[in-house]
Amino acid sequence: DVMKLENEAYAENMKNLNFISEKVLDIRTQVDNLLDFSIAGSQRPIELDASMDVEYIFGDYLSDVCAQLMKSNYEVDAEGISFKQVKVAVNMAFLTRIFSNLTDNIYKYADNKKPVVMKTAFTKKTFSVEIGNGVCDNKTLLKSAGIGLKSVDAMMQRMNGSMSFKREHGKFWVKLEFPIV
């Protein structure tokens, strides 16, 4: 950023600096993904935080994701979010990394002209969060090593939950499922 300020007058330099900034951000993201993957794949047992109401745990996370996406000009459909008086036990540090990873993936791969859909669901035994986004034609998933989603899956398993994803009707969906305690 400092270099950009000092080189404002030179369009070619700005083009190169923007490219370099993009690559630095890509590297930072991959380092974060590797850290997540390492943490998630550890054999050391994790402690789950005390069980709490799902609204208390997930309300702020989902609200923050909505706000971040809308600030970046994404349309968000959060009509499907609802909460019931049930409790889950999670590791908040893992949950923070999971939502950060999913938000980063939306920025990297989603079409910001199509809405990001967020919804919650309940069964007798589980609470789930689903996030779906339109897939942008000029952003390819082939560039991805899939480390981020593998990390999310591993962190979910370590919290006794599960993660699944699917691609259908031009949307990419991620589902996080947590056991109700």
What does each model-identified segment do?
Residues 22-27:
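Short alpha-helical segment of the dimerization/phosphotransfer core of two-component systems
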Residues 42-52, 89:
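Short flexible loop/turn segments at helix-to-beta-strand junctions
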Residues 68-79:
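Short conserved segments within the C-terminal catalytic ATPase subdomain
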Residues 105-107:
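Short helix-loop "hinge" at the ATP-lid/N-box region of the Bergerat-fold HATPase_c
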Residues 113-125:
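Short beta-strand/loop element within the Bergerat-fold HATPase_c
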Residues 129-147:
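Glycine-rich/acidic phosphate-handling loop/turn and adjacent ATP-lid/helix
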Residues 156-157:
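Detector for a conserved hydrophobic position within an alpha-helical segment of the HATPase_c
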